[in-house]
Amino acid sequence: MRMLLKSFFSILALMACITASSAADEGTIIKGQVILDKVPKVEEVVVTADKAVCCKDGPLASTQMLVDPKSKGVKNVIVWLRPNDKIRGNEFPKDKIPEALRKPKAVTHIIDQPKCQFEPRVLAARAGDKLIVKNSASIAHNVNFASPIDGQSFNKLLQVNAELAVENAFTANRFPIAISCNIHPWMAARIRVFDHPFYATTDANGKFEIKGVPEGTWNIVYWHEGGFHMGIDGIYGFATEVKGKTLELKPVTLDFAKKEDKK
């Protein structure tokens, strides 16, 4: 009897996964790429502590702006959808999210700091997800965690080979969560949390995919640690008609300047 029940619940879990996957496949897949017009010179970090460890393999390169020399693709740009309006705080409408994608299984994300940098430096997550911060380095770090909406903030020492599970699950936040290390002040990480599934982070070639998007006109927002694409004008995103099985967008050249600044 116990085996039958176990098999029954396993089948239910599998069916839930298949349903969620089918819902994602039913909508439109948005594919795009974020690039820079020129590949910037890789900057070196000014290391002020633990130089023997942080610089043991040579100068420590900044990870703030990562651009692939060949494709000019920009890594760590978070791309998401929002309503086609200019109302600050409006998020993707819940009634437009397919039922199977409204309450996904929570994911536990991991941020490590093996080489005097947070890895990954930029993270996109969904409300309900959790976070573990690890320290696989041979030196101590500290985790200065500041969440601007839910007040979940702390500053804790993280010894060698230790890990810290953030107590509360993420809540949706229109401002990025900031993580830093007071011992090594150049270290930084950013987390954006959404209450819908229509977001992505660009890969090493600046490419991204957002699956299962309902048809309609949605605004696409591009955000990098350095700011929004097109500055303050880009906060509300750029109107895009979504339809069909796949929508291939033209590459977006990342630019932090406002339209007025270009006149």
Regions found by a protein language model. Give the residues of each.
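Positively charged n-region of N-terminal signal peptides that target proteins for export
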Residues: 1-7
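Extracytoplasmic copper-binding redox domains, predominantly the cupredoxin/blue-copper superfamily
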Residues: 23-263
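Bacterial N-terminal signal peptides
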Residues: 7-19
